[in-house]
Amino acid sequence: MSRHYEVVFLVHPDQSEQVPAMIERYKSLIEGGNGTIHRLEDWGRRQLAYPIQNLVKAHYVLLNIEVDQAVLSELVESFRFNDAVLRHLVIKRDGPDTEQSLIMKSKDEKGDKPERSERRRRDDEEGDAAPAATDTDGDNAEAA
């Protein structure tokens, strides 16, 4: 007996380039078990509400699917044994959700303004480079 589920999983940000392959693997698992995918959204890298494994960002993917329990169990087990998947959430739904999610609607309305994406990229680069330690005089601590 097939039921409707909403599945969200978070992927390690260093593995973002492998997300399309992961999605294809999960799609083939669902469709191979006579399941249906009603909605598939790749939300991209987003800020986490709290750090997970000392990470502040993760790659989000949303699926609305209709599968039976055996396929769902196999899908959840594949999430659990994949080290790149940081977290996953499965919610039982009453029916299929095919319309665009609120996150994707707001993303389309805002658009990704070039100056905003440039600022995000610059902030990411600055966050990766550790600033040099300074003493109270403003000189480098190593020079003292």
From Swiss-Prot:
GO cellular component, one term: cytosolic small ribosomal subunit
Any GO BP: translation
UniProt region (Disordered), positions on chain: 97-144
A GO molecular-function annotation: small ribosomal subunit rRNA binding
InterPro entries assigned to the protein according to its UniProt record, in alphabetical order: Ribosomal_bS6, Ribosomal_bS6_sf, Ribosomal_S6_plastid/chlpt, Transl_elong_EF1B/ribsomal_bS6
Keyword rRNA-binding: yes
Extent of Basic and acidic residues compositional bias: 105-124
UniProt keyword list: Ribonucleoprotein, Ribosomal protein, RNA-binding, rRNA-binding
Highest taxon listed in the record's lineage: Bacteria
Family: Belongs to the bacterial ribosomal protein bS6 family.
Free-text function comment from the UniProt entry: Binds together with bS18 to 16S ribosomal RNA.
HAMAP family: Ribosomal_bS6
Name of the protein: Small ribosomal subunit protein bS6
Natural source organism: Xanthomonas campestris pv. campestris (strain ATCC 33913 / DSM 3586 / NCPPB 528 / LMG 568 / P 25)
Gene label: rpsF
